[in-house]
Amino acid sequence: MTSVGVPIKILHEAEGHMVTLETVTGEVYRGKLSEAEDNMNCQLAETVVTFRDGRSHQLDNVFIRGNKIRFMILPDMLKNAPMFKNIGRAQKGAIGMGLGGLDQRGRGRGTAFRRPMGRGGPRGMSRPGGAPTFRG
């Protein structure tokens, strides 16, 4: 079982509030988010749907499948949700770490500036494009 990410947690926090969402077909739904699932399936109550041609219609309840949602507009009050405070603490520890974070050992062999070995023999036995070295 995988844990849900912060965007899905924020979506669950928006339950009971007015949200606006647009589907991939271009309809815009505005209503009270009754229920949201981890796969972004949403149930809206007291909804106004605006179709692509500009017509609008009032609906009591509507269920929208999660993979048909293009984007959602959530209430501004969710900016103060506790999940964002936890993210802020986690990012403070990562400032200045670069892309890889703390542990960079063992992440590759760094062969960009090493001389080529030849045909795979041990070091010193062959040179690229030439005969083996002779030390006599």
Swiss-Prot record:
Gene: snr-1
PANTHER family the record matches: SMALL NUCLEAR RIBONUCLEOPROTEIN SM
Domain named Sm: residues: 6-78
TM spans (from-to): none
InterPro entries, per the entry: LSm4/Sm_D1/D3, LSM_dom_sf, Sm, Sm_dom_euk/arc, SmD3
An annotated GO cellular component: catalytic step 2 spliceosome
Keyword Nucleus applies: yes
Family the entry assigns: Belongs to the snRNP core protein family.
GO terms of molecular function: RNA binding
Known function: Plays a role in pre-mRNA splicing as a core component of the spliceosomal U1, U2, U4 and U5 small nuclear ribonucleoproteins (snRNPs), the building blocks of the spliceosome.
Annotated protein name in UniProt: Small nuclear ribonucleoprotein Sm D3
Coiled coil: none
Localization in the cell: Nucleus; Cytoplasm, Cytosol
GO annotation terms (biological process): spliceosomal snRNP assembly
Superkingdom assignment: Eukaryota
Span list, region Disordered: 98-136
Pfam family, one: LSM
This protein's UniProt keywords: Cytoplasm, mRNA processing, mRNA splicing, Nucleus, Ribonucleoprotein, Spliceosome
Lineage of origin: Eukaryota, Metazoa, Ecdysozoa, Nematoda, Chromadorea
